[in-house]
Each structure stands twice: as structure tokens, then as C-alpha cells.
């Protein structure tokens, strides 16, 4: 029974995505909504991304320094581990989980509200492909902004580590710099960016799907937002496992 329901939901998701990409609206109309969605979904998330990443980078640096204190351990190991954690997991995977809660609920509730207030029905009556008009700009906006947010997150985390060096004196800036530069593999950076594209697509499409299929009133919109966050978060975790194995 559960498997049947999952397959039915997945089939409805594929049908909706087919509508989204089958007949896009005019480029001028799409461009205006695309810019608006980039601001709403990406630009408005920059502050929270920078703040969380800054403090996480600082905490990682402190914890590594305090818990791996040994005469046999190089002094720069805190900088090295901080860089690897920020590049490989936190800035791409964990940050996208956080954004799934903020952005995913925003997308689902906005589209769900449009559904229950019959705005989507009005678009259909006017002959507009409502799925493409409402959802496609959000998908493209997320695909544009999430990789940039991942880069901002990594940078902010490194700055947070330097804050512990200059202000907290946990580690010297010279040792931190040595660790950050030690054995740097550019592919790790690109791996995080590549994963973020997949996560952005998952968050945008899954959240839009739950919002678009809302039936009922405001209670249904709230449930759709919750389902969107839970489902997109789980899919981000599953895809993170698969992509890490594939790209490593």
C-alpha cells in the first residue's frame, strides 16, 4: 500500500515536471519572474547563510583544536580540517538542508496559497500554462542562487575560523593559513558546487509539487509546507550519499 502510494506520488511529480518544461511562457514574462524569484529565494537567504556558516566555521576550528591537541599532531591541522568540512559537507549538504526549511516552505506555502485562492485556476482559464508560469522561474532561480550561496557559505566559514585565530587566539593565523592551504584539491570545491545544483533542483521541484497539489484551505497549505520540507530534506540526504559516492 505504501509502495503504491509512493509510486503514484512519483508519477504525479513526473507529470507536473513535464508540464513545467513542456510549454514555457514568453521570455519577457519569464525573465521578470526569474529575477523576482532570485531575489526572494536567494538574495533574502544570504544573511542567514553567512551568519550560520561564520559561527559553524569558528566552532569547528575551536573543537578540532581543543580535541585533537597532541604533540604528534601538526599545529595547522585545525585549519585543514575546517576547510575540508566546509568544502565537502557543510556548505553544500548541511546548508542546503537549512535552506530546504526556509526556501522549501516558502515555495510550498506561496504556491499552495495561490491554489486555494484559485489564482492558478484563473491562469488556466486564461490559457496560461500555470505550472510553467509559477514553478519554472523558481526552479531556475534556485539553480542560479544556491551554488552562489554555497560559495558564500564556504568563504564565511573560513572567515569564522580566522576570527577565532585573531580574536580568540585559539590558533595562530599563520598555522590556520598553512592548514587551509595544505594539500588543497580543487575538485572538492567543484564537487560541492555540483552537488548544490542537484539539491537546488530537488528543493525547488519537490516544494513546488506539494504546493501545487494542495486541496482545501489554509490547514492544507500548512500541511503541504511541512510535507515539502520533510520530503525535500530526506531526498537531499539520500542524493548526498549517492552523489558523494559517485563524485569522490
Locations of regions flagged by a protein language model:
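Short, membrane-interfacial amphipathic segments enriched in basic
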Residues: 1-32, 210, 215
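Selective transmembrane-helix segments that form parts of the transport pathway or gating/packing helices
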Residues: 42, 46, 50, 90, ...
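Final/C-terminal transmembrane alpha-helix of multipass membrane proteins
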Residues: 221, 227-243
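Active-site cofactor/substrate anionic-group-binding motifs, chiefly glycine-
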Residues: 41-94, 98
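Hydrophobic alpha-helical transmembrane segments that constitute the membrane-spanning cores
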Residues: 52-55, 99, 136-165, 198, ...
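A hydrophobic alpha-helix feature that marks transmembrane segments and, especially
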Residues: 97-115
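Membrane-interfacial helix-loop-helix connectors in multipass membrane proteins
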Residues: 63-87, 154-197, 201, 205-224, ...
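Short cytoplasmic-facing helical segments at TM-TM junctions of multi-pass membrane proteins
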Residues: 111-136, 221
Amino acid at each position: 500500500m505504501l509502495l503504491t502510494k509512493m509510486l503514484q506520488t512519483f508519477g504525479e511529480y513526473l507529470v507536473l515536471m513535464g508540464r513545467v518544461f513542456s510549454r514555457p511562457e514568453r521570455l519577457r514574462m519569464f525573465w521578470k519572474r526569474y529575477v523576482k524569484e532570485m531575489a526572494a529565494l536567494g538574495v533574502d537567504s544570504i544573511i542567514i547563510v553567512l551568519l550560520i556558516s561564520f559561527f559553524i566555521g569558528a566552532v569547528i576550528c575551536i573543537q578540532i583544536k581543543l580535541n585533537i591537541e597532541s604533540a604528534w599532531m601538526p599545529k595547522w591541522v585545525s585549519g585543514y580540517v575546517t576547510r575540508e568540512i566546509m568544502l565537502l559537507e557543510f556548505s553544500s549538504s548541511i546548508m542546503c538542508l537549512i535552506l530546504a526549511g526556509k526556501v522549501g516552505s516558502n515555495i510550498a506555502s506561496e504556491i499552495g496559497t495561490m491554489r486555494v485562492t484559485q489564482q492558478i485556476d484563473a491562469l488556466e482559464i486564461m490559457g496560461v500554462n500555470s505550472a510553467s508560469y509559477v514553478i519554472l522561474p523558481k526552479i531556475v532561480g534556485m539553480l542560479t542562487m544556491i551554488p552562489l550561496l554555497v560559495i558564500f557559505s564556504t568563504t564565511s566559514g573560513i572567515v569564522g575560523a580566522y576570527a577565532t585565530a585573531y580574536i580568540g587566539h585559539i590558533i595562530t593565523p599563520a598555522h590556520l593559513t598553512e592548514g587551509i592551504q595544505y594539500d588543497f584539491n580543487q575538485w572538492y570545491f567543484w564537487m560541492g558546487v555540483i552537488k548544490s545544483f542537484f539539491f537546488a533542483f530537488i528543493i525547488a521541484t519537490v516544494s513546488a509539487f506539494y504546493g501545487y497539489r494542495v486541496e482545501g484551505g489554509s490547514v492544507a497549505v500548512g500541511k503541504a509546507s511541512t510535507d515539502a520540507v520533510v520530503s525535500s530534506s530526506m531526498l537531499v540526504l539520500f542524493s548526498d550519499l549517492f552523489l558523494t559516492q559517485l563524485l569522490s
